[in-house]
C-alpha cells in the first residue's frame, strides 16, 4: 500500500464500483427504498415490491446506461465522453465481479417482486418489462451500440 500517494487512475469512474463497501451500500440503499415505500400506509405489499423493482431499475438505467461521460475532469482527453457508466466500468472488460453483481442484483429483485406479488399478471408484466429494460443494455453484444442512434452524442 502506498501511503500518501494520489490515485493513478486516468478515469476514476472505471473503478468506483470496486471500492470497499460499495456493494453493501448499494444493497442497503435498495433496502431503505423498500422500507420507505412500505411505510406509506395506502400501498399494499405487492404494489410496494413492484414499485421497489421499477424505481430501482429506472435509477439503474438512468445512472448506468443513459448518462454518459464522467462527473469530473479527467486527463484521458475525453475518451470517456461518449461512453456510458456501464461501458466505462472496469475499463470495459466483460464478466468482472462488479459487472456480475450489477447484472444479478436486478434479477434477484425481480424474483423477490414476482414472489411477493404472487405472480399477478399485471405486476408480472410490469416487473418483466422493467427487468428487460436494464438487462438488455448490459449484454456484451450491445457494448458501445446505440440503437436507432439514441444517446449517440
Swiss-Prot record:
Cellular location(s): Endoplasmic reticulum membrane
Domain-level remarks: Ceramides bind to ORMDL3 N-terminus and stabilize it in a conformation that physically restricts the accessibility of the substrates to their binding sites in the serine palmitoyltransferase (SPT) complex, hence inhibiting SPT catalytic activity. In the absence of ceramides, the N-terminus is flexible and permits substrate binding, thus liberating SPT from inhibition.
UniProt key word Acetylation: no
GO biological process: ceramide metabolic process; intracellular sphingolipid homeostasis; regulation of ceramide biosynthetic process; sphingolipid biosynthetic process
Record topology, Cytoplasmic segments: 1-27, 65-105, 141-153
Family the UniProt entry places it in: Belongs to the ORM family.
Domain of life: Eukaryota
Protein name: ORM1-like protein 1
Role played: Plays an essential role in the homeostatic regulation of sphingolipid de novo biosynthesis by modulating the activity of the serine palmitoyltransferase (SPT) in response to ceramide levels. When complexed to SPT, the binding of ceramides to its N-terminus stabilizes a conformation that block SPT substrate entry, hence preventing SPT catalytic activity. Through this mechanism, maintains ceramide levels at sufficient concentrations for the production of complex sphingolipids, but which prevents the accumulation of ceramides to levels that trigger apoptosis.
Membrane topology category: Multi-pass membrane protein
Keyword Transmembrane appears in the UniProt entry: yes
PANTHER family, A to Z: ORMDL PROTEINS (PTHR12665)
Key words of the record: Endoplasmic reticulum, Membrane, Transmembrane, Transmembrane helix
Regions crossing the membrane: 28-46, 47-64, 106-123, 124-140
InterPro entries: ORMDL (IPR007203)
Subunit structure: Ceramide-sensitive subunit of the serine palmitoyltransferase (SPT) complex, which is also composed of SPTLC1, SPTLC2/3 and SPTSSA/B.
Amino acid at each position: 500500500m502506498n501511503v500518501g500517494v494520489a490515485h493513478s487512475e486516468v478515469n476514476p469512474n472505471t473503478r468506483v464500483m470496486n471500492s470497499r463497501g460499495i456493494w453493501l451500500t448499494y444493497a442497503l440503499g435498495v433496502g431503505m427504498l423498500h422500507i420507505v415505500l412500505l411505510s406509506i400506509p395506502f400501498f399494499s405489499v405487492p404494489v410496494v415490491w413492484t414499485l421497489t423493482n421499477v424505481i430501482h431499475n429506472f435509477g439503474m438505467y438512468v445512472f448506468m446506461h443513459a448518462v454518459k461521460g464522467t462527473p469530473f475532469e479527467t486527463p484521458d482527453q475525453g475518451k470517456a465522453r461518449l461512453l456510458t457508466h456501464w461501458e466505462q466500468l472496469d475499463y470495459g472488460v466483460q464478466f468482472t465481479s462488479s459487472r456480475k453483481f450489477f447484472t444479478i442484483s436486478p434479477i434477484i429483485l425481480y424474483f423477490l417482486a414476482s414472489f411477493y406479488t404472487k405472480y399477478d399478471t399485471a405486476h408480472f408484466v410490469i416487473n418483466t418489462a422493467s427487468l428487460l429494460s436494464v438487462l438488455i443494455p448490459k449484454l456484451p453484444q450491445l457494448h458501445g451500440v446505440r440503437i436507432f442512434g439514441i444517446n449517440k452524442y
